């Protein structure tokens, strides 16, 4: 069904709602405030919509005052659009309020209602305000973002197209303790590239696994591909160990790492080698010419948690990679030949002087399935569906419009064709893996890579194997690799 509301064309199918708007930036736009408000509307019930037009969202603050937001579009998928500024309505009248004021009023209300600690609420509000500022900084820096609508994007371009972040989070762009200079160098929002930080490490201080090569061979291959100028540092007892450059500097400030340096077990070789780009998660990096992507522990609070890996998580990747060698996996693959998983079939970390594996030093090696086709239209779903930072069409709508033009069909027909292909190419293999095999791939939009040809979905790549789990009926399958008691069975 397609209907017009003012300048908005809404195309609805059974699965996806596409909203096409004129790409005109207006003073009413605030995508960061929209994320905050949508998370509030989703998680609380103390609000209402007016029955009169134009529709208003009303959030009561007390008997004598309320916040009023003009609703541009109220979405069945909860991706609501609001016009700003909001208005504070009191018994004596109303006046516009900025985001700092409205967010403070809402936080104060929730603190009073739920009897929350004042210090926690203050920290929360500070993070909300920082995230709001970070979003605008990225939008201001990426003034060419609108040009991304004009063409099919490759993997790297789509990974760095995400400026808004989680659509249902009050502070989706938190990045403590990054300062602005660090944010611009290390976050995908600013489209940077940077080399890795390398260390020469005594092999006794390295823990890890690798499936098809032993760990020494895997790390050597990675170094040879990505920093060949450092190979003269290699020996049987000294291996090359890569780190995210920020994390490398962070580790050198930790006492356990300083002890290793003092004993000559670790030597800092500095930044070297090929440039890498941060993907949507920030801690996972991509180099088009490397056979591996790499996912690091990063001691930074991104959105709502410090992003350090655990041994349990990297072992989940190994578990899934071993399952991929079994007959049942080959059967699943034969049923869905365009469904693939970026296996995380290797990991490594540093040991302290006592032999403990230090989680803040961990990284997982992720198979780069795009090394032979880096320009293919393989796009992370969250970048396609995010609210456009300039208030115009999303990247998904842009793809549907290109599809419409190419096939000579209406936008509504193109939208139905896209969603139908998405259901067959993406949803069906994910649901079948769980229903028939007991394999759960926790496929939020950041982990779904939609492979497209001419803007139409033709395949699925799943990534982030730490988000894999199993249903009880997968026990027999897990037993074939000796993992019947795996910790991620539920």
Which positions does each model-derived feature cover?
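Nucleotide/phosphate-binding site architecture used for ATP/NTP-dependent chemistry
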Residues: 14-425, 452-490
């Amino acid at each position: 069904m397609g209907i017009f509301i003012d300048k908005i064309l809404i195309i609805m199918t059974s699965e996806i709602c596409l909203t096409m708007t004129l790409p005109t930036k207006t003073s009413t736009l605030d995508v960061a405030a929209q994320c905050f408000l949508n998370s509030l509307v989703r998680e609380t019930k103390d609000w209402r919509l007016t029955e009169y037009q134009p529709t208003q969202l009303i959030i009561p603050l007390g008997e004598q005052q309320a916040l009023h937001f003009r609703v541009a579009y109220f979405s069945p998928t909860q991706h609501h659009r609001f016009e700003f500024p909001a208005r504070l309505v009191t018994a004596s009248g109303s006046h516009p309020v900025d985001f700092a004021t409205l967010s403070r009023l809402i936080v104060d209300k929730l603190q009073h209602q739920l009897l929350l600690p004042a210090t926690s609420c203050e920290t929360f509000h500070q993070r909300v305000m920082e995230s709001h500022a970070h979003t605008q900084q990225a939008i201001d820096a990426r003034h060419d973002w609108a040009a991304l609508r004009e063409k099919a994007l490759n993997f790297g371009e789509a990974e760095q197209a995400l400026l808004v972040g989680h659509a249902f989070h009050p502070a989706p762009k938190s990045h403590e303790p990054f300062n602005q200079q660090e944010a611009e160098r290390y976050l995908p929002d600013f489209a940077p590239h940077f080399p890795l930080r390398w260390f020469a490490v005594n092999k006794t201080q390295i823990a890890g696994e690798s499936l098809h090569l032993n760990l020494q061979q895997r790390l050597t291959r990675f170094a040879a591909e990505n920093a060949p100028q450092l190979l003269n540092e290699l020996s049987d007892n000294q291996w090359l160990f890569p780190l995210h450059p920020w994390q490398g500097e962070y580790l050198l400030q930790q006492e356990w790492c300083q002890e290793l340096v003092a004993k000559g077990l670790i030597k800092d070789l500095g930044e070297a080698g090929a440039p890498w780009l941060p993907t949507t998660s920030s801690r996972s990096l991509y180099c088009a010419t490397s056979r591996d992507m790499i996912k690091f522990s990063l001691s930074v609070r991104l959105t709502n948690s410090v992003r350090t890996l655990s041994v349990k998580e990297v072992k989940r990747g190994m578990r899934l990679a071993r399952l991929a060698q079994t007959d049942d996996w080959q059967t699943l693959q034969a049923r869905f030949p365009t469904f693939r998983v970026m296996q995380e079939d290797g990991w490594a970390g540093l040991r302290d002087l006592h032999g403990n594996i230090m989680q803040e030093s961990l990284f997982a090696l992720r198979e780069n399935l795009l090394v032979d086709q880096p320009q293919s239209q393989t796009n992370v779903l969250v970048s396609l569906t995010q609210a456009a930072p300039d208030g115009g069409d999303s990247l998904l709508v842009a793809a549907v419009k290109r599809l419409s033009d190419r096939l000579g069909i209406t936008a509504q027909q193109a939208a139905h064709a896209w969603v139908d292909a998405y259901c067959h190419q993406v949803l069906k293999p994910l649901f079948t893996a769980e229903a028939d095999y007991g394999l759960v791939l926790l496929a939020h939009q950041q982990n779904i890579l939609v492979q497209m040809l001419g803007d139409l979905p033709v395949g699925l790549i799943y990534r982030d194997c730490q988000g894999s789990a199993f249903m009880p009926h997968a026990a027999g399958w897990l037993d074939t690799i000796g993992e019947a008691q795996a910790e991620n069975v539920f």
